[in-house]
Amino acid sequence: MLLLEGAGLALAEQYAHPGRELSPDLEERLLAALERRSSREPLSSIFASAFFCGHRFALNADCLAPRPETELLVETALELLKSRLPLQSRSESGSESKAESNSASRPASSSAAEPRLELAELCCGSAAPGLSLLWELEQLQKGSASLFLGDLSGGAIYAAMKNAAALGLDKSCRFALCDLFPPEKEETLFDLILVNPPYIPRAEIFGLMPEVRDYEPHLALDGGEDGLDFYRRLAASAAACLKERGWLLMEHGAAQEADIREIFADWSQSRGSAVISRCDAAGHDRVLAFQVSGRKDNALS
């Protein structure tokens, strides 16, 4: 991985030329990276980037490095939103002709008459989840969605803007410095809001592994005394930002689902909200989705 990131040598090239000698400059750079890694600095900090959903995202000191388990947010959001895209952008069953299949596999263009999906990622950091979701939707149908990205950190917003431009998605994005919720001037109601909020209980931060404790921004980790402060704020106010049948999709800690369900009890009782839960690859509860609706959306069972 150090050779791949530090030297730009692809894995195939490393396997094809295992005895290749490194230039003095390259050797010096790799030794410096090794020294930093030996002091427990993570690769995402050393190289100021990380891979997520198959894309490389630029990071800085104000961004939490995206985790593999967070890809579940994107996967779940795609399941929820695909049913809302116009029919021509969805893959049909195997009964269609080869010509039809090839046509369906190409991204369609959204017509002016078709409403765009309005998406938001709050506490966005590098915006890896939100931009990955938007990129996938663009492959299904060009111009099908727009994305609001908000964060309290100016450095995080800078990284999000850089990443949106790198993926060619900047024209479909809006950015704002905000304390969790969009500013009042942002009047859009959203079809789906993604949030990976800080959820580590404050007292536990200093017991985390050095790669996280010493190099990740505590602003992106600290969820208050019990780790649930942001979920309480979301439960109190997020519904006002969502369309009818809109979804609030959140990542959470492995042992927090029951507490978050209790915090959101009013959504289920008074709003008739649908609730979806997803586990990560390790079998830990990881994602909760609540729908603002008088009737349940059957996009997922």
PLM feature segments, named:
Residues 82-116, 136-143, 268-270, 294-301:
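Intrinsically disordered, low-complexity terminal tails and inter-domain linkers enriched
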Residues 199-229:
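Mobile active-site "lid"/loop adjacent to the S-adenosyl-L-methionine
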Residues 225-291:
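Conserved Class I SAM-dependent methyltransferase catalytic core
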Residues 27-30, 40-43, 126, 130, ...:
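A general structural signal for well-ordered alpha-helical segments in protein cores
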Residues 72-90, 112-207:
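Conserved SAM/SAH cofactor-binding pocket of Class I
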Residues 3-80:
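Conserved AdoMet
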Residues 2, 40, 70, 129, ...:
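Residue-level signal for inorganic ion chemistry
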Residues 136, 209-212, 266-267:
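Glycine-rich, phosphate-binding/catalytic loops in enzymes
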